Amino acid sequence: MNRFKVSKFRHTEARQPRREAWIGDIRAGTAPSCGNHIKASCSLIAFNSDHPGVLGIVPLESQGEDKRQVTHLGCHSDLVTDLDFSPFDDFLLATASADRTVKLWRLPLSGQALPSGPGLLLGPEDAQVEVLQFHPTADGVLLSAAGRAVKVWDATKQQPLTELATHGDLVQGAAWSRDGALLGTTCKDKQLRIFDPRAKPEAAQSTPAHENSRDGRLVWTGTQEYLVSTGFNQMREREVKLWDTRLFSAALTSLTLDTSPRSLVPLLDPDSGLLVLAGKGENQLYCYEAAPQQPALSPVTQCLLESVLRGAALVPRRALAVMGCEVLRVLQLSDTAIVPISYHVPRKTVEFHEDLFPDTAGCVPASDPHAWWAGSDQQVQRVSLHPARRAHPSFTSCLAPPAELTPATAQPAGTPEGFSSTPSSLTSPSTPSSLGPSLTSTSGIGTSPSQRSLQSLLGPSSKFRHAQGSVLHRDSHITNLKGLNLTTPGESDGFCANQLRVAVPLLSSGGQVAVLELRKPGRLPDTALPTLQNGVAVTDLAWDPFDPHRLAVAGEDARIRLWRVPPDGLQEVLTMPEAVLTGHTEKIYSLRFHPLAADVLASSSYDLTVRIWDLKVGAEQLRLQGHRDQIFGLAWSPDGQQLATVCKDGRLRIYEPRGSPEPLQEGPGPEGARGARVVWVCDGHYLLVSGFDSRSERQLLLYSAKALAGGPSAVLGLDVAPSTLLPSYDPDTGLVLLTGKGDTRVFLYELLPGAPFFLECNSFTSPDPHKGFILLPKTECDVREVEFARCLRLRQTSLEPVAFRLPRVRKEFFQDDVFPDTTVSWEPALSAEAWLGGANGTPRLLSLQPPGMTPVSQAPREAPARRAPSSVYLEEKSDQQKKEELLSAMVAKLGNREDPLPQDSFEGVDEDEWD
C-alpha cells in the first residue's frame, strides 16, 4: 500500500441536525462506571435514565411526523453500568449493573408494553459488572467483566464457558476481536492483555499500555491483528495508541491530545476505519482515521457540540443513509436530548458509492455457543449496503424468544423487577439527575397507563422550563468601557449593582472604582471617568440595600471603606471615604450586607474570621471563628438570624452570630478546593452550594439547613470549567441563575424542597464570554411582558441588561402565578441596634400587579370555538378560493398554447450588414 495514498475520508463533514430532529424530552443520567451509557441497534436506542436501574428505550428512526415515544424499562435494583444490543437481533438487549447481575431482555416492537421481567439472568458476580459485550459471530455468547474477573458466558445454558485468569486490578475495558477469536482487556494495573479464551484462561500476550492507571478503553479495528487503546500518560495527558498483536512490545503509533481529566470513549467503525473519540462531560468530538498499514492515526474532522456529552454510541452500519454518503452516525447522549451526529463524505452525485460502503457483516450468526467453543471460526456472511441489492433476512435469538406481551400491571414496591410503562410521548422537560442520598432506588416502581402515573414517575416539570433570556436593545447598553479590572479575587462577583447605578473596579493603580448610572445608558466618553480612589487594590464591593448611595469597598490592606455617591451621580474623583472600618489583620475576601437590619455588614478575611460591623457606630460588634482555611463565601439567611459559610477545608458551617462565635452546625462541603459559593434557598430551609468535585467537575449541592451533618440532600453535576459558578437566587420564583466569570452560558434551575430538587429550565447563551453577571431587584422587571428576572451582563467593553421572560398567551392579564408579592428589600425592618440587641424583623411585602391589570387567575375562561362539521369545509368554498381557482385555470389555459410567438417570424440580417 502506498503510504502517501490520499484518504477518501479526508473531506468528511460532521453535521448536527436541527433541534427538531433531536430526540428530546428525555431525562438522561450517568453512572460512575466504564460504560458508554447509550447503545443502538438498527431499530432501537437504549440509554441510562436519571433513575437508578432504569433505562430509556426509544426507536432509532421516527415514523413519519409522529414524535418518537420514550418508554422506560426497570432493569435492576441498582445502577445500570453497561448495556449492549445483540449484533444479530435488534430487540435483544443485555444489561449489566452494580447489583452484580447481567440480564437479557426481549424488547417489543414500538407501541407494545415493555416486559416486566428479564428473559435470562446471569450471575450474581463477586463485584459490580463493569463491561458487557456480545460475541460478534456466535449467537448466545457474551463476555462480562466484574472487578478483576472476566467471564465468557454461554447464555443459552446461563453458565460461563470459561473464566479468564484474574487481573492485577480492576478491569476497565474488554472487547472481542472482529473475528471473535481473541479478547482484549485494559486494566487499572496499566496492562493491555490479549486472550485466546478457547485455548487457555491465561493471557496470550501482555504489555504496558498507558503509564497512568486512570480509565482505559480499547477497540479492535477491521483487521483482526490491530487494536486501538485510549488512556492517560504519566503527565495526565490523554493519549491514543495503535497496536499490532504480532509486535506487541510497543505501540505502532501514539497520539497525545490534552490534559482533560475526562476519559475518552473510543467509537470505531471497522469497515471504514473511522475512529471517533468522545470525552464524557465535554462538548467536542474528535474523528480520526485508523490506518494500521501506514501506520497512522490521521485527523479527519472535529465537531463542537451544543451540549455536554454524557455518553456516546455508534449506529450500526446497516442503518446508515448510504445514498446520502453517510459513512458514520454518532448518538450523543446529553442531559435532555439524544443528538444524532452524521458524518458525510461530500460527493457530486446522489448514488451508491461502492468505495465508501463495502459489504458489511449481516445479521445472521455464523455459529452457536457449542460450535464456537468447539473451535469453529466461521465468519458472519457479509451483505451489500446497496438499497437495491440489500437482503433483509430476519433473525430472532433463542436466548429470549418473543412472547405475547400484555401490558404489565403495577408491581408492589420493593420488587427487584416490575418497572414497566406503556409508550407515551414525554412532553415534560428533562430534569438532571440528583445523586444525593435522598434519591432511593426505583426498582420497585410500577406504572399505570394514566398520564398522572407517568408524571409521578418522571417527576414534576418547571413552569419556567420555556424561559427565554435575551439581551435588551442597544439603546439600554453602557458602552466604551475601558480598563476594567478582570483579576478580582474569585470570592468577589467582580462588580455590583443596585436599581440606580453600577460600581466597577478599574485596572488602574490606586484601587479605583467607576460608578455608572443605569438611567444614563450610551457611549461613555473617551476621557477618564470620575472614580472612587481607595489607594489599594479592591478585593470586593457591595451596595447598601437600604441606602442606594452608599458603597462598601474592601481592600487588600484589610480595611473597609464606605463611600457616599452624590444623588446625581459621581461628577469628580473622590479620595476621602465617608468612613473606614479597621479590625481585620489580613486581606478581606467578601462583603455581605444584612438583609433586614440597617447598617449591619458582614466581612470575611484571610485572618479566617467573619466580622460583623455596625456601620452607624463604625466599629466591629461580633466576630465568628472556627474556620481552618480560606473562606470561599458567606451568606445571610432570609430572616437575618443565621449566617452560613463555605470553606476551603471542605466544611459548610452555620452560625447564629448573636448567640455564639462558634458554628451552630457543621457538615461536609464540596470535595474540590478550587472555590465555592453558598446561598440560602427555599425560604431559608435549604442551602445551595456551588463548587467542584474531586475531578474538577462543577457541581451543585443542596443541604437541609437543619441537618448539615447528614451531607447534601441532592448533588447535581454540570460541566468541567475553571471558574466557580456564581449563584443568583430569586426567592419569588425559586429560580437560581448560575454562571462563572469567563462563561458564555447561564444555567437556570428551579429549586424544590423535595425530590427531584432540581428542575432544569432553558439556559441563556451568549456569543462571547462575560466577565460578570448580576441579578437586579425585582422592581426592575417589566411585569407586563412577563419578565421575571432582569440581570446585568458585564463584557470586556460594555454593560448589557439581560431580560428573562416567560412565554404566555394571555399577556393582557397579570400573571399572578409568576409574580407573587415580593419583599420590599430596599426598606429595613429594624435598626442595627435593635438587631444586635436580639430583636428580629419581618419585611414588608409589595404586590407587583400593575394598575388596571386583572390577575390571570381571575380571568374569564375563553369559550371554545365552535367547529363546523367537516362536510361544510368539503362542500363550501369561499370567494377567495373561487377566485384563486379561476386564476389558476386561466394561467393553465394560456400556458398550454403552442402558437408561434411574434418574434419567431422575424428574419435576421447578414453578418456584413452589421459593419
Curated annotation (Swiss-Prot):
<keyword id="KW-1017">Isopeptide bond</keyword>
<dbReference type="InterPro" id="IPR015048">
    <property type="entry name" value="DUF1899"/>
</dbReference>
<keyword id="KW-0677">Repeat</keyword>
<keyword id="KW-0963">Cytoplasm</keyword>
<dbReference type="Pfam" id="PF16300">
    <property type="entry name" value="WD40_4"/>
</dbReference>
<dbReference type="GO" id="GO:0030041">
    <property type="term" value="P:actin filament polymerization"/>
</dbReference>
<keyword id="KW-0653">Protein transport</keyword>
<dbReference type="GO" id="GO:0015031">
    <property type="term" value="P:protein transport"/>
</dbReference>
<keyword id="KW-0832">Ubl conjugation</keyword>
<feature type="repeat" description="WD 2">
    <location>
        <begin position="124"/>
        <end position="163"/>
    </location>
</feature>
<feature type="modified residue" description="Phosphoserine">
    <location>
        <position position="456"/>
    </location>
</feature>
<dbReference type="InterPro" id="IPR015505">
    <property type="entry name" value="Coronin"/>
</dbReference>
<dbReference type="GO" id="GO:0005802">
    <property type="term" value="C:trans-Golgi network"/>
</dbReference>
<protein>
    <recommendedName>
        <fullName>Coronin-7</fullName>
    </recommendedName>
</protein>
<dbReference type="InterPro" id="IPR019775">
    <property type="entry name" value="WD40_repeat_CS"/>
</dbReference>
<feature type="repeat" description="WD 5">
    <location>
        <begin position="533"/>
        <end position="573"/>
    </location>
</feature>
<dbReference type="Pfam" id="PF00400">
    <property type="entry name" value="WD40"/>
</dbReference>
<keyword id="KW-0333">Golgi apparatus</keyword>
<feature type="repeat" description="WD 4">
    <location>
        <begin position="209"/>
        <end position="253"/>
    </location>
</feature>
<feature type="compositionally biased region" description="Low complexity">
    <location>
        <begin position="859"/>
        <end position="869"/>
    </location>
</feature>
<keyword id="KW-0472">Membrane</keyword>
<keyword id="KW-0853">WD repeat</keyword>
<feature type="repeat" description="WD 1">
    <location>
        <begin position="75"/>
        <end position="115"/>
    </location>
</feature>
<keyword id="KW-0813">Transport</keyword>
<feature type="repeat" description="WD 6">
    <location>
        <begin position="583"/>
        <end position="623"/>
    </location>
</feature>
<feature type="modified residue" description="Phosphoserine">
    <location>
        <position position="453"/>
    </location>
</feature>
<feature type="repeat" description="WD 7">
    <location>
        <begin position="626"/>
        <end position="665"/>
    </location>
</feature>
<dbReference type="Pfam" id="PF08953">
    <property type="entry name" value="DUF1899"/>
</dbReference>
<feature type="modified residue" description="Phosphoserine">
    <location>
        <position position="905"/>
    </location>
</feature>
<dbReference type="InterPro" id="IPR001680">
    <property type="entry name" value="WD40_rpt"/>
</dbReference>
<dbReference type="InterPro" id="IPR015943">
    <property type="entry name" value="WD40/YVTN_repeat-like_dom_sf"/>
</dbReference>
<keyword id="KW-0597">Phosphoprotein</keyword>
<dbReference type="GO" id="GO:0005829">
    <property type="term" value="C:cytosol"/>
</dbReference>
<comment type="function">
    <text>F-actin regulator involved in anterograde Golgi to endosome transport: upon ubiquitination via 'Lys-33'-linked ubiquitin chains by the BCR(KLHL20) E3 ubiquitin ligase complex, interacts with EPS15 and localizes to the trans-Golgi network, where it promotes actin polymerization, thereby facilitating post-Golgi trafficking. May play a role in the maintenance of the Golgi apparatus morphology.</text>
</comment>
<dbReference type="GO" id="GO:0003779">
    <property type="term" value="F:actin binding"/>
</dbReference>
<keyword id="KW-0968">Cytoplasmic vesicle</keyword>
<dbReference type="InterPro" id="IPR011047">
    <property type="entry name" value="Quinoprotein_ADH-like_sf"/>
</dbReference>
<feature type="compositionally biased region" description="Low complexity">
    <location>
        <begin position="399"/>
        <end position="413"/>
    </location>
</feature>
<comment type="subunit">
    <text>Interacts with clathrin adapter AP1 complex. This interaction takes place at Golgi membranes and not AP1-positive endosomal membranes. Interacts (when ubiquitinated at Lys-463) with EPS15.</text>
</comment>
<dbReference type="GO" id="GO:0031410">
    <property type="term" value="C:cytoplasmic vesicle"/>
</dbReference>
<feature type="cross-link" description="Glycyl lysine isopeptide (Lys-Gly) (interchain with G-Cter in ubiquitin)">
    <location>
        <position position="463"/>
    </location>
</feature>
<feature type="repeat" description="WD 8">
    <location>
        <begin position="719"/>
        <end position="759"/>
    </location>
</feature>
